[in-house]
Amino acid sequence: MRSPIDRPCHTKEFRRRRGANWLTLGFTYAAMYMGRYNLSFANKALADTYGWDKTQIGTIITAALTIYGLSAIFNGPIADRIGGRKAMLIGVFGAVVFNAAFGLGAYVGFLGTGPFLIAYFASVWALNSYFQSFSALALIKVNSAWFHVRERGVFSAIFGSMIQSGRALIFVIGGIAVMLLPWQWVFFIPAGIMAIMGFLTLRFVRDSPEEAGQPPFDTADASSGDTDTVNMKYLLKKVLANPVTMTIAAAEFCTGFVRHGFEQWFPRYMQEVQHLPLQSFVFQQGAFVVVAAGILGAFIAGTASDWLFDSRRPPVAFVGYALQIVCLCVVWIAPGLPWIIGAFVLNSLGISMVHSMLSGTASMDFGGKKAAATATGLFDGMQYIGGAAVGSGMGWLLDHWGWVSWGPSMIAFALVGSLLMLKLWNAVPARRPSPASIPAGVAEEAA
């Protein structure tokens, strides 16, 4: 194991400017999470208002997740070319427009309540997902230039906790708003928060230390020592010709089925199976602990990866998949509400461990700062394509087989993901030799 002395010791000014950069970026992404997962809290309200079954609601979910997945794959190279800051601004303001448009769907009664209205909601939510797909690409692209490979695990944990704060807010706001206000406010409120964070991103975020007036430094990732020109050929070769990145992409497909199968449907499961209103104390407390577990999972994953596994990501992801398998078995058996809540909490922890390690960190490591967005697009895109099946597909399954089929449908995917991580257990990014130099912006410790 490498000694922690391999970590760079940055100047105070560098740390201050980087802090302003990643705090703004992280909370902007958290706001976008609110505008992505709010649909799960309007799921039952939409069904009750318009008389739709789970398969019809699932159509909206599938359209959105499919478009997100495909868009992330194709927008990754674009974000690598235009930079993360521009990509985030495109994403956040697009998401503002289409969250507002989804809420305004409450006032288009002339479409009726049948296929035309479903088509409207599915189209608008798919467009929201297109712009949402820029968010992860932008986040990883910017951070890949600001964080050394030996810092990324822990800082990905910090980012993971910030992102989960957006999820926590929509758990609280969504649950209360859908009960006290018309359902459309579950979309209007996140739109307003995203707009504020978009303007802060414009003001504070910069793509690299150099753009913020700081000296550059060697991040020691897959781009280290790489002087090739960044073009489409370079990006595709860097990511698609790498067996490690393609194996991670396959694992992320499995992650998507489990993650979205859980996150898109668990509020409705609690309402219909456990008979808990979204505003109830038990649901609110349980949802809070689920989010807290996600935050804890990101911290456990980042710390274990950097300090126990020498900045290797697959071993930690394997543990996350194993946790998911155990928890989904408990959900399948459904021994009682306390057990179900406990399984939800640990499942959230396991999902967060995998997500922060693969989409959040391995993409920077194996894509390098030059191709980080392309790698993220591939990983995140495959995750959402895998998740697309939990929309209409899961809706059909639940309509025909009931909630007893929910847990078992996700177990096999978690198992395949765990086996793929065993295959990559010792994988680390390859580096090109670079000229010996003292990294600018890094204050070396005195000998």
Regions picked out by a protein language model, each given a short descriptive name:
Residues 124-165:
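Cytoplasmic helix-loop-helix junction between adjacent transmembrane helices
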Residues 39-43, 242-299, 355, 359, ...:
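Extracytoplasmic gate region of multi-pass secondary transporters
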Residues 311-361:
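C-terminal transmembrane helical hairpin of 12-TM major facilitator-type secondary transporters
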Residues 37, 65-73, 167-168, 291-299, ...:
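Residue-level signature of mid-helix packing/kink "hotspots" within the transmembrane helices
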Residues 2-15, 208-248, 438-447:
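Juxtamembrane intracellular "pre-TM" segments in multi-pass secondary transporters
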Residues 93-114, 322-335:
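C-terminal ends and interior cores of transmembrane alpha-helices
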Residues 81-92, 306-321:
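Cytoplasmic membrane-interface "Motif A"-like loop-to-helix N-cap segments
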Residues 159-210:
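Helix-loop-helix hairpin linking two adjacent transmembrane segments in secondary transporters
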